[in-house]
Swiss-Prot record:
<dbReference type="GO" id="GO:0005886">
    <property type="term" value="C:plasma membrane"/>
</dbReference>
<keyword id="KW-0472">Membrane</keyword>
<dbReference type="InterPro" id="IPR039808">
    <property type="entry name" value="Cadherin"/>
</dbReference>
<dbReference type="GO" id="GO:0008013">
    <property type="term" value="F:beta-catenin binding"/>
</dbReference>
<dbReference type="GO" id="GO:0045296">
    <property type="term" value="F:cadherin binding"/>
</dbReference>
<dbReference type="GO" id="GO:0000902">
    <property type="term" value="P:cell morphogenesis"/>
</dbReference>
<dbReference type="GO" id="GO:0044331">
    <property type="term" value="P:cell-cell adhesion mediated by cadherin"/>
</dbReference>
<dbReference type="InterPro" id="IPR002126">
    <property type="entry name" value="Cadherin-like_dom"/>
</dbReference>
<feature type="glycosylation site" description="N-linked (GlcNAc...) asparagine">
    <location>
        <position position="661"/>
    </location>
</feature>
<feature type="topological domain" description="Cytoplasmic">
    <location>
        <begin position="757"/>
        <end position="916"/>
    </location>
</feature>
<keyword id="KW-0130">Cell adhesion</keyword>
<feature type="domain" description="Cadherin 4">
    <location>
        <begin position="508"/>
        <end position="613"/>
    </location>
</feature>
<feature type="domain" description="Cadherin 1">
    <location>
        <begin position="170"/>
        <end position="277"/>
    </location>
</feature>
<dbReference type="GO" id="GO:0007411">
    <property type="term" value="P:axon guidance"/>
</dbReference>
<feature type="glycosylation site" description="N-linked (GlcNAc...) asparagine">
    <location>
        <position position="412"/>
    </location>
</feature>
<dbReference type="InterPro" id="IPR014868">
    <property type="entry name" value="Cadherin_pro_dom"/>
</dbReference>
<feature type="topological domain" description="Extracellular">
    <location>
        <begin position="170"/>
        <end position="734"/>
    </location>
</feature>
Length: 916
């Protein structure tokens, strides 16, 4: 091909750039409404005729295309009912691409879906066309058939002799069509791309884009030197419907020689996919008795092939229908939309409840010879309508019930209804239309059996009604279908017999109230409390008895019910509440079995003046001087008005001292004041009689005693302590006697204590006069002591070395002391016997003890060093070494004579002369 060749305009066939995104629809359980593609592309010529079809968009609403409408946002294009896009007028497209939006909307749900339509304008020339090239355009040739044609890339023209430069213009290369599923051999050449500059300089060619250097990789390749482009493997339109590549031309140094051009490669569809139903089983329903043409359901099948070609155009048909009753063609299907509708009348749920329809979908526009097919099952359920009125199984029913029974089922009414059980079309509703004007009965529906239960809701008396003839009508909860009339068997008669039973007697007036005055004597006839036996035809006798008579005041005649008093009726009794006394009586007949009824008699007791007033208070206190205070008195009466106040308070004339000492002042009808009449009354307790009289007819009087304590009072009128004692009934002499008794008792207690102390002193003295043979100090006592000092720290060792100082020791407090300690208390003095002292006796006694200790090998210190605990400073004992037992000086033992006769022997031992 040379640069001077003419431009041949190649007419491009209409094809859409489709994207493969169909999934395996057999695994989907739900349908998603919308366009099959989001973006549709088609190649068109620049001149478009009015009504010319450009492409077809495919839309699925999942319920059929019925009610789906299309519109565009361009006035130049419209969409038909089948999705075909066409021009509304003759157009000359000025640009290389036109885009607009197609909208599908459902008129029933008002939902909308959008898709974009792109129209590409192709402008090419061919050297074989015989036409001259147009100015301003480069020659670009594209021929996919071998031998491949050369495609010239645009390049800038040189400046002509007039100094003008042609303007460079980019071109849209016509798409390259590649059939899918090609068997090769591969690589298979598609086209050769060549620049018109390759005669001047060496050029290298390359391609980029999806399918070249982007996944999927290396689907297409190009010879860098010759510019021949190849496809390397079979294509699948369902994976990629189109490819967009860019071709590049550079010199050997990598410098761009030409601008990149766009290459569109479309995979030509082949019918290699069967239609697939969205669901393998479809469920629909239609009312029984529906007219022909009634919509039932929609089945939808999708084909992965190109929907704009016959490969993807699916048509539907019904293969079989089971059962074929009442006709083998009860339904039909719209071949394009998949809508199933009724085609014949006679749908009856009571005969056929469900149909199974096999639907076939075939592509190639339904051509069974060339198209691929698939099937699905449509289950059509015939829904119930109320076209069968309920009918009684019998024209009459009967039952019986004892009188006075309620909530008792008398009879069960059975009905038959051929509609669907336990649905509003089957559930029965019963209604009594005649025979029960008083409303004694109702008919309730058993929810399980649908039977009518005739129930007594209001007690029936055999003596008034012995039988009932009811008329009952039955209907359904749902109204009957149009054109269906009620059956004469929807009404039945019910005969109900009432059985007589022994009814209990009853008191016509219950509770019965009578009024009378209290205090009527026993045997008084009060009233006749009789009962009535409702069993008038049995001629039974009624007997009466008491059931409750708390105070046992009444008696009833067993045959006629006459009530008399058995005791005096007292309104003020504890058995009377609010002036009413209540008793209950029993009336029993002699039927088999006997029946009884109760009646209550209420007696309202009218008050009479039978209770005298009582004075209040019973005790009080008052000052011994009359001008300080007084006692307020009143009265209490068990009766009621007018048999109570105003009261009259007065003092009796006997004894005369009462009126002499006391006086009563009336305050009002209920109160008075009791005060002293004299100027002074000795303190004490006084019983003051007062006569109280009520205002009854006749009036009653009562003499009551009030105990009054008279006592001295302080300035505030309150009794003082002495006064309170005196007011308790003790005189001055009694008080003095009590005080003397208290003093005598205290004196006796003091004497007893002194005697006990003296007895204690004598006991200690006797212990000092015990014989030496009995002295426990001569006994050998073993103590678990290992040295140290005395445990008895209270013992005064100074008395051993300074006995003369004992006379100056102060008296010690009474308590426990040593038996060898001299008492320090006051003692009677005895005359001192003249004695010659024997100062050597004590020395001999000590020396003898020392000798015995030295000769005793068992006595301490065992020739060993003894360590004694330090007893602290201040000890009056001093050092043991201070004891001087070898002194021959005279010792004065005269102080022993001061110890009394009990120590006479000891004084004689140390106070006498020396004995040889």
């Amino acid at each position: 091909m040379t640069a001077g060749a003419g431009v041949l305009l190649l007419l491009l066939s209409l094809s859409g750039a489709l994207r493969a995104h169909n999934e395996d629809l057999t695994t989907r359980e739900t349908c998603k409404a919308g366009f099959s593609e989001d973006d549709y592309t088609a190649l068109i010529s620049q001149n478009i005729l009015e009504g010319e079809k450009l492409l077809q968009v495919k839309f699925s609403s999942c319920v059929g295309t019925k009610g789906t409408q299309y519109e565009t946002n361009s006035m130049d294009f419209k969409v038909g009912a089948d999705g075909t896009v066409f021009a509304t007028r003759e157009l000359q497209v000025p640009s290389e691409q036109v885009a607009f939006t197609v909208t599908a909307w459902d008129s029933q749900t008002a939902e909308k879906w959008d898709a974009v339509v792109r129209l590409l304008v192709a402008q090419t020339s061919s050297p074989h066309s015989g036409h001259k090239p147009q100015k301003g355009k480069k020659v670009v040739a594209l021929d996919p058939s071998p031998p491949p044609k050369d495609t010239l890339l645009p390049w800038p023209q040189h400046q002509n002799a007039n100094g003008l430069r042609r303007r460079k213009r980019d071109w849209v290369i016509p798409p390259i069509n590649v059939p899918e599923n090609s068997r090769g051999p591969f690589p298979q050449q598609l086209v050769r791309i060549r620049s018109d500059k390759d005669n001047d300089i060496p050029i290298r060619y390359s391609i980029t884009g999806v399918g070249a250097d982007q996944p999927p990789m290396e689907v297409f390749s190009i010879d860098s030197m010759s510019g021949r482009m190849y496809v390397t493997r079979p294509m699948d339109r369902e994976e990629h419907a189109s490819y967009h590549l860019r071709a590049h031309a550079v010199d050997m140094n990598g410098n761009k020689v030409e601008n990149p051009i766009d290459l569109y490669i479309y995979v030509i569809d082949m019918n290699d996919n069967r239609p697939e139903f969205i669901n393998q089983v479809y469920n629909g329903s239609v009312d029984e008795g529906s007219k022909p043409g009634t919509y039932v359901m929609t089945v939808t099948a999708n084909d992965a092939d190109d929907s704009t070609t016959a490969n993807g155009m699916v048509r539907y048909r019904i293969v079989t229908q089971t059962p074929q009753s009442p006709s083998q063609n009860m339904f039909t299907i719209n071949s394009e939309t998949g809508d199933i509708v009724t085609v014949a009348a006679g749908l009856d749920r009571e005969k056929v409840q469900q149909y199974t329809v096999i639907v076939q979908a075939t592509d190639m526009e339904g051509n069974l010879n060339y198209g691929l097919s698939n099937t699905a099952t449509a289950i059509i359920t015939v829904t119930d309508v109320n076209d069968n009125p309920p009918e009684f199984t019998a024209s009459t029913f009967a039952g019986e019930v004892p009188e006075n029974r309620v909530e008792t089922v008398v009879a069960n009414l059975t009905v038959m209804d051929r509609d669907q059980p336990h649905s509003p079309n089957w559930n029965a509703v019963y209604r009594i239309i005649s025979g029960d004007p008083s409303g004694h009965f109702s008919v309730r529906t058993d929810p399980v059996t649908n039977e009518g239960m005739v129930t007594v809701v209001k007690a029936v008396d055999y003596e008034l009604n012995r039988a009932f003839m009811l008329t009952v009508m039955v209907s359904n909860q749902a109204p009957l279908a149009s054109g269906i009339q009620m059956s004469f068997q929807s009404t039945a008669g019910v005969t109900i017999s009432i059985m007589d039973i022994n009814e209990a007697p009853y008191f016509p007036s219950n509770h019965k109230l009578i009024r009378l005055e209290e205090g009527v004597p026993p045997g008084t006839v009060l009233t006749t409390f009789s009962a009535v036996d409702p069993d008038r035809f049995m001629q039974q006798a009624v007997r009466y008895s008491k059931l409750s008579d708390p105070a046992s005041w009444l008696h009833i005649n067993a045959t006629n019910g006459q009530i008399t008093t058995a005791a005096v009726l007292d309104r003020e009794s504890l058995y009377t509440k609010n002036n009413v006394y209540e008793a209950t009586f029993l009336a029993a007949d002699n039927g088999i079995p006997p029946a009884s009824g109760t009646g209550t008699l209420q007696i309202y007791l009218i008050d009479i003046n039978d209770n005298a007033p009582e004075l209040l208070p019973k005790e009080a206190q008052i000052c011994e001087k009359p001008n300080l205070n007084a006692i307020n008195i009143t009265a209490a009466d068990a009766d009621v008005d007018p048999n109570i106040g105003p009261y009259v308070f007065e003092l009796p004339f006997v004894p005369a001292a009462v009126r002499k000492n006391w006086t009563i002042t009336r305050l009002n009808g209920d109160y008075a004041q009791l005060s002293l009449r004299i100027l002074y009354l000795e303190a004490g307790m006084y019983d003051v009689p007062i006569i109280v009289t009520d205002s009854g007819n006749p009036p009653l009087s009562n003499t009551s005693i009030i105990k009054v304590k008279v006592c001295p009072c302080d300035d505030n009128g309150d009794c003082t302590t002495i006064g309170a004692v005196a007011a308790a009934g003790l005189g001055t002499g009694a008080i003095v006697a009590i005080l003397i008794c208290i003093l005598i008792l205290l004196t006796m207690v003091l004497l007893f204590v002194m005697w006990m102390k003296r007895r204690e002193k004598e006991r200690h003295t006797k212990q000092l006069l015990i014989d030496p043979e009995d002295d426990v100090r001569d006994n050998i006592l073993k103590y678990d002591e290992e040295g140290g000092g005395e445990e008895d720290q209270d013992y005064d060792l100074s008395q051993l070395q300074q006995p003369e100082a004992m006379g100056h020791v102060p008296s010690k407090a009474p308590g426990v002391r040593r038996v060898d300690e001299r008492p320090v208390g006051a003692e009677p003095q005895y005359p001192i016997r003249p004695m010659v002292p024997h100062p050597g006796d004590i020395g001999d006694f000590i020396n003898e003890g020392l000798r015995a200790a030295d000769n005793d090998p068992t006595a301490p210190p065992y020739d060993s060093l003894l360590v004694f605990d330090y007893e602290g400073s201040g000890s009056t004992a001093g050092s043991v070494s201070s004891l001087n037992s070898s002194s021959s000086g005279d010792q004065d033992y005269d102080y022993l004579n001061d110890w009394g006769p009990r120590f006479k022997k000891l004084a004689d031992m140390y106070g006498g002369g020396e004995e040889d």
